[in-house]
Amino acid sequence: MWGENIATADLFANATDIHSIVQALTTLANASDVFFLVVMGVLVFMMQWGFAMLEGGQVRKKNVNNVMMKNMVDWLIGCVAWLFIGGILCSKGFDLSAFIDWWKQILGTNWPNNGLDLASWFFGLVFCATAATIVSGGVAERIKFSAYVLISLIITGLLYPLFVYLGPWGASIVPWHDYAGSLVVHGLGGFLALGAIAALGPRIGRFVDGRPVPILGHNIPMAVFGAFALAIGWYGFNVGSSLALGDISGLVCATTTMAMAGGGIGALIASRNDVLFTANGIVAGLVAICSGTDVVSPIGGLIIGLIAGLQVPIVYKLVEKAGLDDVCGVVPVHGTAGVIGAILTGILGLKIFGGAGGVSLIDQIIGAVFCIIYGTGLGYILAKIVGIALGGLRVSEEEEKMGLDMAEHKMPAYPEETVI
Amino acid sequence: MWGENIATADLFANATDIHSIVQALTTLANASDVFFLVVMGVLVFMMQWGFAMLEGGQVRKKNVNNVMMKNMVDWLIGCVAWLFIGGILCSKGFDLSAFIDWWKQILGTNWPNNGLDLASWFFGLVFCATAATIVSGGVAERIKFSAYVLISLIITGLLYPLFVYLGPWGASIVPWHDYAGSLVVHGLGGFLALGAIAALGPRIGRFVDGRPVPILGHNIPMAVFGAFALAIGWYGFNVGSSLALGDISGLVCATTTMAMAGGGIGALIASRNDVLFTANGIVAGLVAICSGTDVVSPIGGLIIGLIAGLQVPIVYKLVEKAGLDDVCGVVPVHGTAGVIGAILTGILGLKIFGGAGGVSLIDQIIGAVFCIIYGTGLGYILAKIVGIALGGLRVSEEEEKMGLDMAEHKMPAYPEETVI
Amino acid sequence: MWGENIATADLFANATDIHSIVQALTTLANASDVFFLVVMGVLVFMMQWGFAMLEGGQVRKKNVNNVMMKNMVDWLIGCVAWLFIGGILCSKGFDLSAFIDWWKQILGTNWPNNGLDLASWFFGLVFCATAATIVSGGVAERIKFSAYVLISLIITGLLYPLFVYLGPWGASIVPWHDYAGSLVVHGLGGFLALGAIAALGPRIGRFVDGRPVPILGHNIPMAVFGAFALAIGWYGFNVGSSLALGDISGLVCATTTMAMAGGGIGALIASRNDVLFTANGIVAGLVAICSGTDVVSPIGGLIIGLIAGLQVPIVYKLVEKAGLDDVCGVVPVHGTAGVIGAILTGILGLKIFGGAGGVSLIDQIIGAVFCIIYGTGLGYILAKIVGIALGGLRVSEEEEKMGLDMAEHKMPAYPEETVI
């Protein structure tokens, strides 16, 4: 295996004319696309670990294992739902023949062009799993594990792929510009969470006599490491969204970087040096830039990030004032940041503002409204239906006080610190 | 440096005929292979960090620094052993002239084709280090640090490369299909650990009057983060095993993903929502798919993963019943999962089951038996010899009770929580 | 989006003659360079997370959130400083017209060749941010957050880019061989820290009656995970420094690996199994190899690493003896390791020692001396000026005792373990 090199250069060993060169180049190009989609997809898959740390750090010790299980299991279930349903629904809608062709193909190993279709399937999967796992951060510390698993299954198998199909990545029934999913992934995740949060109700002790009482997480550095891992993975999220090596864009890399910087600085200023808001501001800046990362200038990226970061502490307080317990602030970090990003794309993407053009503010606003209604509405309805189906959406009051780690998984997160 | 772009495109600036184009393409192809092997190798190297977290979370506070040292030092030693011996032994066997040529070459900087041979050497190294570090999880909390270092040196310098040479990646004296090492790396690591565990004996208090008494690790989230890091790295492990960009396979990416999902879901079900078994089930699914990841269908991958995940809690109990103290469950997660994966490759790799064909169940069974005997036998013998050479394999009872962090490294893992 | 493949292979669909093939190849080459620079740059960006863990683990619980904020904010500020000033100053010096052209360009989206210039800009940014964040580890646990932010701004906007411009990556006014920045990044960062440490003074209780009193960090495994993340990122640091896919070098990958091994083993031996020194030895080996990673042999890399690792505990003691409180040992790990690596490049890079040649020991010594003077001098002056500008460089004694997390950020790192 090592030492004897099977080299890609062998492709060109017998290339002696135009035709044979082009044939060899086509193989190299397909292989390069598979490599591109796998590396970018693995970076996005790293965001599952990032979300587990970001959410894990922001919950109490007695619920950390439950967060670990939710973040592992929504990925595991997402893979199966995306293989059998999601991956086809999102591009072909409810076309039964397309499903049957696909089911036949995944029973075999006949995948031409170095398996490019499966690399593309993988890149779609990690986007779907990201949308689903965002909800976890909003409903933490009181949702039943079985309810969360069922909600994840329905999001990854139906709600997300259908939203994709209706939006710009599918049949464009509702067309807006969304290069890497400010609305398709993050806005949807954030507003699905809003609906579920409303259906679920707040944690015990989160509001006392209508007054909000902060419930701090157990490990702030763990949450910051989560933000770092998300920021690293985000380069796969945005730069990978060219879907082909040949269309990769250095501009997307730069606007992603500057929006991250703007998001962190905006939240740092608005929260007066708060560690968690600064970390979440970085994520909000990255959420906001997804939509227009390919059509705004680097300065435009910085501006989008700044606005997205500044709004995080503000919207967090508004959600709290509405009596909603959004544990990890997913509504401001993914919901409203996604909407703001999409709308600003319709402005800073215009040529007069240095953008590449080809965007319309109206389309962006329509997309945003559609996302808010689709997400919040279906998030609420889904949570209520699952609650009925499982005899309740929440663990019992006694279980919530004991902590979900012991109640649902029979194991504390830090055994030597807990008398079992 | 920045701003003035030395671009790869310059390769083609003077390409004016077939010959000059092919020459430039050969350079691009070699450079792309080096880039491919480095990126995939770095993902596998990330698994060293994953193993450090997976094992670190599953030991008590008083032994965490010792786990950190074992996982750093088996890598450091593996680099040296692989440079001087392992990297040649695995492909050329005991051919002295090949060793001499290699030793001359590593004293210099003459490495043609963009140093492709050294990129290939690096990719072989990270596989070797993975096999060695698996043993660490089985022998934790009571092995002498010096004994572990010596065992690692012999595994990375002799036992692993020799096993590679005898198997399908070397001279194929024992031929079986093992695309990314279900047996060559993980089965070997798991059964070497079994042999060493048997030679070492259990931790104090692990069995009382013959009854097993669980000794919980100190940080379950740390272990789960380890499983996430391993899963991320595994895409380098499997997809990188094409060894050349031109042979990359999207099918390998998909079967790896589905086996991960099957492994986690299988262990989740078999352990009734246990956090550690679910995380280890994800790893077991990934171990099992290595062998046939290129010849089974995506559904085949899911099935292999499910079976590998289901068996983890079952085999863990059997090993425990046999009075063996496998701290991190490396026998079920790497040993039996590797064997199951290899054997199922001989079934689900057949054309009648949608596989790509070119596999034989008999070969797979022979390879599995060879791996179990070679690993367990040499693991036991090696541990016994090292024990004799160092005046004992284990730290003293007093040191084991104090904890290896203070006994062997004079520093607690969490200084502010420990009175020194 | 998924399912309908826009493939890179389409580039060659209409390539029917030499000219059209070369045109398509130029696009593929540029896209490959952008992909190369983004992936390598993301690996280096991962080192920000590595530094946050390495430093976070080596400070006490009451200062961990402050370390998180410093490591997030020096990145955020670095992005902005590098976009507006640093990225141009480093290659064009104080050429106003070059600044104006650049500022015009970043207000727009006109970036040819797949945005290759912006990918190159991004790769420069992550190097700059690395140099700045090294200082954080030296000044931890007593510097004002506002002072640190201002120091980072001036390092990333002025001191680092100017040093680059003067050195081998810019106008080469002081020419030495520094492939990936032993001096340009790490030596500079280490000696800037030395100057700032001298200006800042030690932590309360670090020296009692002139005798050094160790102040242990709170989480050694966190620091080791930081070293792992840095080592992973370092492959981007060194292998990415070819700046173009076509010039990638497998030799750089191998010498980087062997220097890492030498560094860890050297520090392990010199510190007699100390966990933190071994982890920092790995980093020191990687620092030292940056300069000559492309011109020394794999054995040369091992030797450079060994020497760099051996010196870490020795220089740490010398700095301590000088009454200087270098919390994370950045002077031996980045400063002197960088100088040693640069000088050894002038020896082991020579042909007689198996090197590729083209290096001069005199140049390397001149570069080292220039770096020590530039770094220590400007580090000291900058810290003093910032101290004056902000009414003091340090937090008050009372704040230092309370801990910077509560004093500067109003939030403990582990809320459930602290009575707020």
From Swiss-Prot, chains A, B, C:
Alphabetized PANTHER family for the sequence: AMMONIUM TRANSPORTER (PTHR11730:SF6)
GO cellular component: plasma membrane
Keyword Transmembrane helix recorded: yes
Protein name according to UniProt: Ammonium transporter Amt2
Site, Twin-His motif. Important for optimum substrate conductance: residue positions: H186, H334
Quaternary data: Homotrimer. Interacts and forms a complex with GlnK2.
Family under the similarity heading: Belongs to the ammonia transporter channel (TC 1.A.11.2) family.
GO terms assigned for molecular function: ammonium channel activity
Any one of the GO BP annotations: ammonium homeostasis
Keywords: Ammonia transport, Cell membrane, Membrane, Transmembrane, Transmembrane helix, Transport
Membrane topology: Multi-pass membrane protein
Gene name, Swiss-Prot/TrEMBL: amt2
Ranges annotated as spanning the membrane: 34-54, 71-91, 120-140, 149-169, 180-200, 220-240, 250-270, 273-293, 295-315, 339-359, 365-385
SUPFAM superfamilies: Ammonium transporter
Locations listed in the record: Cell membrane
Function: Involved in the uptake of ammonium/ammonia (NH(4)(+)/NH(3)). Transport is electrogenic.
KW Kinase (keyword) present: no
Pfam families membership: Ammonium_transp (PF00909)
